[in-house]
UniProtKB/Swiss-Prot annotation:
Residues 1-235 are annotated as: Alpha N-terminal domain (alpha-NTD). The gene is rpoA. It comes from Buchnera aphidicola subsp. Schizaphis graminum (strain Sg). GO terms for biological process: DNA-templated transcription. InterPro entries: DNA-dir_RNA_pol_insert, DNA-dir_RNA_pol_RpoA/D/Rpb3, DNA-dir_RpoA, RBP11-like, RNAP_asu_C, RNApol_insert_sf. This is DNA-directed RNA polymerase subunit alpha.
């Protein structure tokens, strides 16, 4: 080893010890004295907070309108079922969002192996319990949405953000995207030739089985390196302006008129005039609607009130309507 007053040793990945399928020890050495704790603490925080993963974010259960209800023939209440789905370990290849379904009937346990999914989805623990059916005539059907993300996003922070697009009966789930369940590190003494004042860093992690430990360490180190690049060059570098692409139309305008929950009479009158989307409706004026057969002032008032509740009105001008997505349908 070449002795140098200012030179630094570069650590190497010495050993990956697979204790169980989800429990791993990773050893790196040699590190300069003190660097074991410096790097160990930084990597630990990044591994806990910044590893991307997949989590269940929304669930629709037939016959269930809210999470505080129960379902006949099911032992668990809806909140407990959502908690069980929250802990479901899912790995998806090549997609940021997927939908899965479940349809089970008869007495017995409902597990992750009962979930129907496509070939891009991998469920790590097929025996993961979801609920119990306690009656021969009992059944449960659900639609499960899985998304990619990082960190922890509680359902409460997404309620208002997704209200306009979320159908009735869609239950939000606290999204725990991190594939790292637990992580700790330990620093031991290491030796290289005559030097005995070096550090050995041992990182012990427990995952949900969706990430390779070596890949996790590599990602965490890359994130740390990218964050430290700003300190390498402290000159004032002007950040490039990022232009946010706004959607061509507000999402609510692309929703069908049926979502307004109008009376049957009003809804049928609009469909007869080929008014299928809310964007079609808001462009009509009061005079135009009153010319619609069988649509009177009472129906017009109903339509205006419902639009006003959504910050919309009749007589709006929408350029480039209808969008290409509707024309393709």
């Amino acid at each position: 080893m070449q002795n140098s007053i200012i030179g630094f040793l570069k650590p190497r990945l010495v050993e990956i010890e697979q204790i169980t399928a989800t429990h791993t020890k990773v050893t790196l050495e040699p590190l300069e004295r003190g660097f074991g704790h410096t790097l160990g603490n930084a990597l630990r925080r990044i591994l806990l907070s910044s590893m991307p993963g997949y989590a269940v974010t929304e669930v629709e259960i037939d016959g269930v309108l809210h999470e505080y209800s129960t379902k006949e023939g099911v032992q668990e209440d809806i909140l407990e079922i959502l908690l069980n789905l929250k802990e479901l370990a899912v790995k998806v290849h090549g997609k940021d969002e997927v939908f899965m379904s479940l349809n089970k009937s008869g007495i017995g346990s409902v597990t992750a192996s009962d979930i129907i999914h496509d070939g891009d989805v991998e469920i790590i623990k097929p025996d993961h319990l979801i609920c119990h059916l306690t009656d021969e005539n009992a059944s449960i059907q659900m639609r499960i949405k899985v998304q990619r993300g990082r960190g922890y996003i509680p359902a409460s922070s997404r309620i208002h953000m997704e209200d306009d697009l979320r159908p009735i009966g869609c239950l939000l789930v606290d999204a725990c995207y991190s594939p790292i369940n637990r992580i700790s590190y330990n620093v031991e003494a290491a030796r290289v030739e005559q030097r005995t004042d070096l550090d050995k860093l041992i990182i012990e992690m427990k995952t949900n089985g969706t990430i390779d430990p070596e890949e996790a360490i590599r990602r965490a180190a890359t994130i740390l390196s990218e964050q430290l690049e700003a300190f390498v060059d402290l000159r004032d570098v002007k950040e490039p302006e990022i232009k946010e692409e706004k959607p061509e139309f507000e999402p609510i305008l692309l929703r069908p008129v049926d979502d307004l929950e109008l009376t049957v009479r009003s809804a049928n009158c609009l469909k007869a005039e080929s008014i299928h989307y809310i964007g079609d409706l808001v462009q009509r004026t009061e005079v135009e609607l009153l010319k619609t057969p069988n649509l009177g002032k009472k129906s017009l008032t109903e339509i205006k009130d419902i639009l006003a509740a959504r910050n919309l009105s009749l007589g709006m001008k929408l350029e480039k309507w209808p969008p290409s997505s509707i024309l393709e349908e």
